[in-house]
Amino acid sequence: MGIKNLTQFLKKYKVYETIDVAELKYSKICIDTPMFLYKFVSQYPNSNEWLGCFVTLITWLRKWNIHPTFVFEGKAPPEKNQTQEARKESRQKIVSKTDAIEQDLRTYLKSGTITPLLLDTWQKIRSKSTKSLLVKRPLNLIVKNFINVDEIRLEIDRRRKYEFSITFAHVNLLKELLDLMGVGYIQSKGEAEADCVSLWYNNAVDYIVSEDTDVLAYTFAGGAPGTSTPKKVPNTTDLKVITGFNVGESSATIISKQRVLSTLKMTAESFKDFCIMCGTDYNKNIFRVGVEKAYKYISDYKVIENVPLDTSVLDHHNVRKIFRVKKSIKYADKVQWSKYPSDNFVEVLNTFIWTHAGGTVDSDHVFRVLTDPALDIVFE
């Protein structure tokens, strides 16, 4: 997701910064929800235990007096259709391959026949292992003596974990939990990250939380066209994106857009063109022009129009419009300070988690943190 290979590219320039989470106290953040929803559901694809992950995240944020607003995904623009179809095809190929591995394993258990696919799967499992054989053995001896049925079954289970889709049921359950915990959320009509960026330009939030590098490509387009509403000055502070939290170390990883632009010696508009040349969810990159070449081209020629290549595949005129947000107040009023829990919060939360996830949480602890964030309590 996001700009193709941009994260790895930016890591080389050391533009990511780790800060103490205490620096985020009393701030409002908007969260690109699909990122967390996919990550947490993937841990528990066959149950609703993922709800506990959100309870932990929200409680940890509120412990540090950080006030989140979750932004849910809406309908993607038509330019994203090709990417979505490609992802579906890729997912189906993975499912088909897992089915084949499972079938070959059954064949092996019945007849002892090791197919090339089963052999390849086992060799890849072995190569990932930190333990290596001290003595090199011939390939046929390794297969005969060391094929591990249990390890292959674990690999099949691991692959099956990602055979899920985020459904309306997941989204509705999470919204119900957020209401219960007094945390705001926004149902976007379009891309969640676009509305996150719009909220920041509208001075509604202090930080954006997203692993999606798309958020760095957006620029501000001013007031809504065709209206008499005067254009207000957008947020001119440095856009900072939180790409991850480390609960154990009480830290956050942040990337500053201004630092990126300064380091790469680019303007916001040239950086946008650089991102488009890398390839995005809305366009392909030019054949054999990856992130390094894209950077060189834009550094030399500043804009895509000047690049001496056939750039038609980039569809850059349309994609530039997608990466342009307008000043808007349609969601700003939904960004609020988190609310105190109700008097019967403990009972209601316990009932909710037990009903939907079949487990329990330390509701008393959650209640204490939500009512007094300054309490120095570690959530477990």
Swiss-Prot record:
Q: Which residues form a coiled coil?
A: none
Specify whether Electron transport is a keyword of the entry: no
So what EC number does this one have? 3.1.-.-
Binding residues annotated for Mg(2+) 2, in chain numbering: D212, D214, D281
The record describes how the cofactor is bound as: Binds 2 magnesium ions per subunit.
Q: Where does the signal peptide begin and end?
A: none
The answer to whether keyword NADP applies is no
List positions binding Mg(2+) 1.
D32, E73, E191, E193
Q: Give the top-rank taxon of the lineage listed in the UniProt record for this protein.
A: Viruses
Q: What are the record keywords, sorted?
A: Endonuclease, Host nucleus, Hydrolase, Magnesium, Metal-binding, Nuclease
Report the family membership. Belongs to the XPG/RAD2 endonuclease family.
Q: What does this protein do?
A: Probable endonuclease.
**What name does this protein carry?**
Probable RAD2-like endonuclease 076L
Q: Which organism is it from?
A: Invertebrate iridescent virus 3 (IIV-3)
Organism ancestry:
Viruses, Varidnaviria, Bamfordvirae, Nucleocytoviricota, Megaviricetes
